[in-house]
Amino acid sequence: LVIAPQWIGDAVMTEPLLRRLAARGERLTVGALPWVAPVYRAMPQVADVIDFPFQHGGLQLKARRAIARQIEGRFSTAYVLPNSLKSALLPLLAGIPKRVGYLGEARVGLLTHRLKNPKNKPPMVAFYSALSGESGLEADRPVLKLPPAEVDAALNALGLQPGGYAVFAPGAEFGPAKRWPAAHFAAVARGLDVPVLLLGSGKEAALCDEIAAAAPGRCTNLAGKTTLLQALAAISAARHVVSNDSGLMHVAAAFGVRQVAVFGSSSPLHTPPLNDRATVLWLKNDPAYQPPLDCAPCFERECPLGHTRCLNDIDAGRVLASL
């Protein structure tokens, strides 16, 4: 049993771990929250996906005990990918004898095979892959695959033709210090020769409306209007994807789509889009940008200095040139 992370990007970055486990003969069932479960259904090495009925926050012991009773006796090993206490509870309650995970949140007694959290910030793909117990791991590229029939059905439902559009994912759940300005996204939309789909959650609908209004006739706002499966399919068949450091950035990378990823407060050394067709724009490592961004990466939700130069100063022309 694999206990999945709760964010789309993190879920994508676990794929190389699951590939390693499957290659050595382990039959994989993934337990995931409903909003990330479709990501695991796009991984052929996953035999089964259990949708966990949990919500953000709280231990929700009653719900965890109920699931534990349902899966008791089915699994010999659990890989607990999140570092939270509550994530490690279910395998214990289900009586799974081998429970593998990183130390954290006072869960030393909940795990039987414990890894220490690295003091540096390794690439997240390598961080997850280390749970396999194998040494010398590198950050392998995550790969997602959807059955062609599912892609065709999703594109037909959205009225799309493969390669006939670009996708913008302008949101970033973490906070505004990871979001490239709406005006910059709109400028890119005006400069492209294909229509643009704006994808994201319902929380990002207003942001996408702002972009669409600034690029009249160029954008279709689908934020909050698609299933995650439809969003995955749309990204997989897009000509280009432009995004911040977000979950949908990792989805585009895993499908090998041509993409530009704009980084601000976070670091592409930690969560890069592992894709040969990706261009990363990050002013921190641009020697031509002056004065240097000594403040980056700050990993803050909002710019503590109030200027957000790391994002504001990446103009639309650089993105268009990269596409």
Feature annotation, model-predicted:
Residues L1-L323:
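Catalytic machinery of carbohydrate-active enzymes
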